[in-house]
């Protein structure tokens, strides 16, 4: 990708459906005994990989652009046509273990993968599945789980997570919907994607209360039906475009968004000196020319999202002053620091804390995005750099941003790609 310095952006950017919601909702569809219709599903390589994984389990999929019909009548326990590598490439593939275990009383799923941004163990998932009455073992790179009750059903339980894990909360939330009795989950993650999942499951006939808080109660039911559901807007994509406006000192409007999902980001941008106005599901951002350096510490929702740490660091390199950026969610999420330094940024890295001495003019060069969000940060930094930058590692970008370059070009950026990963709009 070649990115030319953008003096000013102006206009409106449409936010796609949430990647992280889409993936878990696709897995949740496995719980239904009828078709599930999802709309606002983004065209992303992660979604395509997840689609192929579901098809390999006997699921029939029909896609028309951003709409997806998932039919589970042919669902089988084990993937027959896809290698473990396909599962390893997508961490969200592990979401399938909960629905399979809930419906069939057993499941066999390869160990998950995803971006290399530190250890994201599945210990919490496994311990919670055991608490629901499953025997869980790791055999030759597979997680094998079986319900041990005579009825081959999971049994409701009170489970307290050791940490606020989004993946574990979602996995056990799905598994418990078809369990016998009531499950109470404590110290649960509170991310909006969990609320999105619970809302769809309730429309399918589940009985879930408390999603979005630190305690969720699930009353098990005998079956879940199909439904039609619209994926919520992607809060991380929206936040990325807010940072794009700030880093280029440009006015932009962004929609659709759920402002409550972005409160921590909006507060930090306002602290920087950006004027942000609300109108329904639309945000308008008008940055001041002279922004101020601010500190951030990543936290689980409702704190500042780790997925926007890299884009925000790129912004801080363009602001005069010293900012301290602390990463507390993942232990290996500073891969972008070296690339920003190659562009002329002054950053001192001490473990998971970066001290950014901002105000230097970034210079265009060749950089590589090592993961999804650092790749987005490289694009944003290049918009503010003098000259033309070349960005490698676009396979990461295509995992989580739909039409990223096209959306930015529509508001005045000058970005060209020499190669793109083809995404089929119909299947």
From Swiss-Prot:
EC number of the protein: 2.5.1.7
InterPro entries the record matches: Enolpyruvate_Tfrase_dom, Enolpyruvate_Tfrase_sf, MurA_subfamily, RNA3'P_cycl/enolpyr_Trfase_a/b, UDP_GlcNAc_COvinyl_MurA
Pathway info: Cell wall biogenesis; peptidoglycan biosynthesis
Modified residues (2-(S-cysteinyl)pyruvic acid O-phosphothioketal): 115
Classification via Pfam families: EPSP_synthase
EC top class, as a word: transferase
Protein's name in the database: UDP-N-acetylglucosamine 1-carboxyvinyltransferase 2
Taxonomic path: Bacteria, Bacillati, Cyanobacteriota, Cyanophyceae, Synechococcales
Gene: murA2
């Amino acid at each position: 990708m070649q990115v030319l310095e953008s003096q000013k952006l102006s206009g409106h950017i449409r936010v796609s459906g949430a990647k992280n919601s889409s993936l878990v909702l696709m897995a949740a569809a496995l719980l239904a005994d009828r078709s599930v219709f999802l709309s606002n599903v983004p065209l992303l390589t992660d979604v395509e990989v997840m689609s192929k994984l579901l098809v390999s389990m006997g699921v029939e999929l029909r896609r028309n652009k951003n709409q997806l019909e998932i039919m589970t009548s042919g669902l089988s326990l084990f993937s027959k046509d896809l290698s473990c590598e396909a599962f390893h490439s997508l961490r969200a593939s592990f979401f399938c273990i909960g629905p399979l275990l809930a419906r069939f009383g057993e499941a066999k799923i390869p160990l998950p993968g995803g971006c290399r941004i530190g250890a994201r163990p599945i210990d919490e998932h496994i311990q919670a599945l055991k608490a629901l009455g499953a025997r869980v073992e790791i055999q030759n790179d597979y997680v094998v789980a079986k319900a041990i009750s005579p009825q081959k059903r999971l049994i409701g339980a009170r489970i307290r997570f050791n940490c606020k894990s989004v993946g574990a909360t979602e996995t056990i939330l799905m598994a418990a919907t078809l369990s016998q009795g009531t499950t109470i989950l404590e110290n649960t993650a509170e991310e909006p994607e969990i609320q999105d999942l619970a809302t769809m499951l309730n429309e399918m006939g589940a009985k879930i209360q408390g999603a979005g808080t630190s305690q969720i109660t699930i009353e098990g039911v005998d079956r879940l039906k199909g439904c039609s559901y619209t994926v919520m807007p992607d809060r991380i994509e929206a936040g990325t475009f807010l940072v794009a406006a700030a880093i280029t000192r440009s006015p932009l409007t962004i929609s659709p968004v759920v402002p409550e999902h972005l409160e921590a980001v909006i507060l930090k941008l306002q602290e920087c000196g950006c004027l942000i106005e609300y109108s329904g599901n639309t945000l308008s951002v008008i940055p001041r020319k002279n922004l101020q350096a601010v500190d951030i510490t990543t936290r689980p929702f409702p704190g500042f999202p780790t997925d926007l740490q890299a884009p925000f660091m790129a912004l801080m390199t363009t602001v005069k002053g010293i900012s301290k950026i602390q990463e507390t969610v993942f232990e290996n999420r500073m891969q972008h620091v070296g690339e920003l330094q190659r562009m002329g940024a002054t950053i001192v890295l001490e473990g998971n804390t970066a001290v950014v001495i901002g105000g230097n003019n970034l210079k265009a060069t060749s950089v590589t995005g090592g993961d999804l969000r650092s790749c987005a940060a490289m694009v944003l930094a290049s918009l503010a750099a003098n000259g033309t930058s070349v960005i490698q590692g676009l396979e990461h970008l295509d995992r989580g941003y739909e039409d990223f370059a096209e959306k930015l070009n529509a508001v005045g950026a000058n970005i060209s790609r020499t190669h793109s990963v083809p995404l089929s709009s119909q299947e």
